[in-house]
Swiss-Prot record:
Name of this chain's protein: Small ribosomal subunit protein eS27
Residues annotated to bind Zn(2+): 22, 25, 41, 44
InterPro entries to which the protein is assigned, alphabetical: Ribosomal_eS27 (IPR000592), Ribosomal_eS27_Zn-bd_dom_sf (IPR023407), Ribosomal_zn-bd (IPR011332)
Pfam families: Ribosomal_S27e (PF01667)
UniProt GO MF annotations: RNA binding; structural constituent of ribosome; zinc ion binding
A GO biological process held by the record: translation
Native source organism of the sequence: Pyrobaculum aerophilum (strain ATCC 51768 / DSM 7523 / JCM 9630 / CIP 104966 / NBRC 100827 / IM2)
Assembly information from the UniProt record: Part of the 30S ribosomal subunit.
Highest taxon of the lineage: Archaea
Keyword annotations of the record: Metal-binding, Ribonucleoprotein, Ribosomal protein, Zinc, Zinc-finger
Length: 67
């Protein structure tokens, strides 16, 4: 009887880097999806991401999810 090999699952992280656009000035910058600190726009200073203990609440527009 042949031995069956089970497929080994490799765990993938659920967090990603996200390219966000500031709604005020249009600046695009890369933020972390599970940010632990308040993320502000580097140009105008508007808050783009607020930490919630898990995934950050995004106040800017998501342009692209980087993998």
């Amino acid at each position: 009887m042949p031995v069956r090999f089970s497929k080994v699952l490799i765990p993938q992280p659920k967090s990603k880097f996200i390219k966000t656009r500031c709604p005020d000035c249009g600046n695009e910058q890369i933020t972390f999806s599970h940010a632990a600190m308040v993320v502000r726009c580097l140009v105008c200073g508007r808050v783009l991401a607020i930490p919630t203990g898990g995934k950050a609440k995004l106040a800017g527009h998501v342009v692209k999810v980087l993998e």
